[in-house]
Amino acid sequence: GGLWEFPGGKVEAGESVAVALRRELHEELGIAVQTAEPWMHVRHAYADKTVLLDVWRVQSYDGEAQGREGQALAWVMPAALADWSFPAADRAIIDALTAVAAPSDHAAR
């Protein structure tokens, strides 16, 4: 408890990951995903279970995101995510987001 989490949930029987993404983001945030693509897979072993996370990039959606299940909602810049408390399984996602958002050493000067 008391940790921040990225929106998402479980894939239901007979449901594709893409359909689950759209359903979960509608249920949790009230948005209708228009375009999204798979981005990364995370496997994390806790002491009592192993979780597998399919992480997607949502490029466009309709609606205004709001916490529809009683949860708080915050838009956070990737560089600031390290200051927030997340479950251990989300660390790989935060590291990847931070790396993608960081300026490249090869950027034009």
Go through each PLM region and give its residues.
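Generic C-terminal helix-cap and adjacent flexible tail
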Residues: 98-109
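NUDIX/MutT-family hydrolases
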Residues: 55-57, 65-97
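Conserved Nudix-box catalytic region and its N-terminal flanking loop in Nudix hydrolases
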Residues: 1-28, 40
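A structural signal for well-ordered alpha-helical scaffolds and beta->alpha junctions
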Residues: 18, 49, 87-90
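Short histidine/acidic/glycine/proline-rich micro-motifs that form metal-
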Residues: 11-12, 44-45, 80-82
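Active-site-adjacent beta-strand/loop module that shapes the phosphate/pyrophosphate-binding cleft
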Residues: 32-33, 41-65, 72-74
